[in-house]
Amino acid sequence: MSNAPILLTPGPLTTSIRTRQAMLVDWGSWDRDFNQLTASVCEQLLAIIDGASSHHCVPLQGSGTFAVEAAIGTLVPRDGKVLVLINGAYGQRLAKICKVLGRTYSTFETAEDQPTTAADVDRLLAEDSAITHVALIHCETSTGILNPLPEIAQVIKHHGKRLIIDAMSSFGALPIDAREIPFEALIAASGKCLEGVPGMGFVFAEKNALAAAEGNAHSLAMDLHDQHAYMAKTGQWRFTPPTHVVAALHEALQQYNEEGGLPARHQRYADNCKTLLDGMAAIGLRSFLPAEIQAPIIVTFHAPTDARYQFKDFYERVKAKGFILYPGKLTQVETFRVGCIGVVGADGMQAAVNAVAEVLREMEVLDI
């Protein structure tokens, strides 16, 4: 495993040996010990947002997008209307989910380097009383932009509407307190800032809203009301759970708490981000976002303009030096992305910068 590349991606990401070793044990999906493992995971997840008194944690098999679709399909009534706030590819995905589910929705889109503002949301809600829910990406992973969640949440509360937060790339590293930020649902997954492996999403659903959601869901497997009710009654998952993923997440959460929880995880990622930004700037690579709206999760860089630069060749050369990058998902500008998260520290980030510099020299890329 020592020769395995470091994943500088927004998830899946590099995991610890302890987390990987936790998957060497097989679990019976209906066994009491596994039920206790699931309950412990949910309890620890709720503690991160101080949400035990206000929200249920409902785990779901699959990717984070499965959980996002389940949250919208379960919690938005069939006669509801969702305002989708978009400034990147994952906001676009929220809108596509609403369309496929047959939920009425409207969109408000800003440029990929412009956060949605609370004033925007205030105006949009004042103009359309039919809106029941607002769906927001906290950290838009396609660029790394951070949207102003606390301010937007208060505006939504003021209008008496309900907030659904896709916190896939922020949960566990950026503070979100359920006692201070009103939301009906917050969605995240195992393979991001918690440094588990992919395969399980989870939804923090406001207790009263979840209780009232019976019959809303478009799907049996993605019915969060039924999933929670069955778990509350039996301690078990309704359908075969990703046992090894749950075990890995339980171990990753132990390491999360040993490290110092959210403040320590945030600080390490912030240090990684600073090392990355400073190092890339020193070799002439420009970041896509200004620092004040850059989340310490993933950084997007403008691609060099030199004709000798080709991303596929660049990617393979950097990979050969031990680092896996991520292509940009922007439609307007050619970019590439470098993640700051996973089991990596500032020294690893500096090594990645050095690898990028070496590759650009090898490719004779001069015009950056």
Swiss-Prot record:
InterPro entries noted in UniProt: Aminotrans_V_dom (IPR000192), NH2EtPonate_pyrv_transaminase (IPR012703), PyrdxlP-dep_Trfase (IPR015424), PyrdxlP-dep_Trfase_major (IPR015421), PyrdxlP-dep_Trfase_small (IPR015422), SP_NH2Trfase/AEP_transaminase (IPR024169)
- EC number(s) from the headed UniProt entry: 2.6.1.37
Transmembrane intervals: none
Per the entry, which co-factors are needed?
A: pyridoxal 5'-phosphate
Q: Which GO terms describe its biological process?
A: organic phosphonate catabolic process
Top-level EC class: transferase
The question of whether Transferase is a record keyword is answered with: yes
Q: Superkingdom, according to UniProt?
A: Bacteria
Report if keyword Membrane is assigned: no
Q: Which residues carry this modification: N6-(pyridoxal phosphate)lysine?
A: 192
SUPFAM superfamilies on file: PLP-dependent transferases
Q: Keywords assigned by UniProt?
A: Aminotransferase, Pyridoxal phosphate, Pyruvate, Transferase
What reaction(s) does this enzyme catalyze? Answer: (2-aminoethyl)phosphonate + pyruvate = phosphonoacetaldehyde + L-alanine
Matching entries from Gene3D superfamilies are given as: Aspartate Aminotransferase, domain 1, Type I PLP-dependent aspartate aminotransferase-like (Major domain)
Entry's Pfam families?
Aminotran_5 (PF00266)
Q: Which GO terms describe its molecular function?
A: 2-aminoethylphosphonate-pyruvate transaminase activity
Per the record, the similarity remark reads: Belongs to the class-V pyridoxal-phosphate-dependent aminotransferase family. PhnW subfamily.
Report the protein's function. Answer: Involved in phosphonate degradation.
Q: How does it assemble?
A: Homodimer.
Q: Which NCBIfam families match?
A: PhnW-AepZ, PRK13479.1, transamin_PhnW
* Name of the protein in question: 2-aminoethylphosphonate--pyruvate transaminase
